[in-house]
């Protein structure tokens, strides 16, 4: 059996510095590594606990990127206390939904990064 494992979420932001500030200053994620390529394009790998996010101005796979594609995915993070985690988030336009009980039985809230990517923080009440 093949056991694929989630490695990271890759984001090619329209404003690298704004996205870096969002993930570091708003979410409080730790920087694992930062780099600048031979053309001066920046990148950073961030640790959000169980998920890594890579932000890069010029990805190696840029030829398959579609910057005009509509929003198609939301990153869902499994957290232990939605209200406590939300209290750590500074106020701002990045808040899409405050903590609420959703139809899946989770307590969740949703943020939007500077490029419009959604990040849902889910406290699952019923664990399987």
Predicted features by range, described:
Residues 118-121:
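Short glycine-/small-residue motifs
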Residues 17-18, 84:
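Alpha-helical macromolecular-interaction surfaces
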Residues 1-8, 30-77, 86-112, 123-128:
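Vicinal oxygen chelate
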Residues 19-24, 89, 113-116:
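Conserved active-site tyrosine of GNAT-family acetyltransferases
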Residues 13-16, 38-39:
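Conserved beta-strand-loop-alpha-helix junction that forms the acyl-donor binding cleft
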